[in-house]
Amino acid sequence: MMKKDIKIAILMTCHNRKEKTLQCVSTLCDALARYHVSASDGNIDAKLFLTDDGCTDGTAEAVGRECHTRNLQRTIVKGDGNLYWAGGMRLAWMMALKDEQSWNYYLLLNDDTLLQPDAFSMLFNAQRYCLDTYGCEGIVSGITSAIGDSSTMTYGGEVFVNKFTCRRRLLTPIGKPQLCDWAHANILFVPHQVVETQGILYKGYVHGQADLDYSYKARQRGIPVVVTAQICGTCNFDHPDVAAISKLLCAMTFSERRNYLKHPLHSDADYLLMTRRCMPQKYPLTWLFRKIHLYLPHFYYWLHKKR
């Protein structure tokens, strides 16, 4: 019997990180090739949908050449440089939905993430786990470790330790998939039926939090959200720690701090939106603390230590 190809739309967005983006696409192609060699249930028919969000360093052109060399279909769409992560990923996802092909899965992939050679086997194994355990496919987040340090986990999925304060614990691999409360989209594998149920990333997000919202809303709908059984890729944690950001903000004037916190990369707006949509009971207190963060940063970080 002839095996059916599994159709996967790969979704990425990029902005002036040519070398990182090329490394990501190279490991993607390696993982696809590895799966084609070892697959027992059909090959992958993949196509890359990349948002070029105002790149000036030739990222999109270099990716196009790499895809041509590696025989990977691609559609590259231009942004204006102001889409940021959430906007760029939404645009790539919308392009995939408009494509003439009908996709079985969508793989959201950060351009600073390097896939393990057997990444697709891990993702499909996690889907089989969802089917066996929950009776349906779900959202799978690939666990990532720091580059060159497999003992330090960086992204994947988290479970709440205290839902009211939003304290969370990052899951580490245990040899089988684990259910999580919310998931990161460094490597996020979404079946088409989930998209039919809840659509794509919510349009209100500019940069961050959209992946957390998406996975949390899926859990509310009864859709399983799990992490892979093993490390699925590598990606360095690129967010400043509390000590560094508190030192930076406390040294700023009020005007500097306000402008900093208005920038999409640091804005409170995405976090407040996520809180209002996912944890509305926590929103008033979160809004208050965000104001304290702006007006009284020393007091805010003193309170943070007391949590």
Can you say where each PLM-predicted feature lies in the sequence?
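A recurrent flexible, glycine/aromatic-enriched loop bordering the glycosyltransferase active site
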Residues: 169-190, 257-259
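Short, acidic, metal-binding catalytic loop of nucleotide-sugar glycosyltransferases
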Residues: 26-44
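A conserved acidic beta->alpha catalytic loop
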Residues: 51-61
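A conserved hydrophobic helix/loop-capping motif in glycosyltransferases and polysaccharide synthases
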Residues: 8-24, 31, 51
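Short beta-strand-to-loop element that shapes/binds the nucleotide-sugar donor at the catalytic cleft/hinge
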Residues: 135-154
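Short beta-strand-to-loop acidic/aromatic patch adjacent to the donor-nucleotide binding site
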Residues: 102-114
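Glycine-rich, basic loop-to-helix element that forms the pyrophosphate-binding segment
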Residues: 79-99
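Non-catalytic, C-terminal membrane-associated alpha-helical segments of glycosyltransferases
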Residues: 246-307
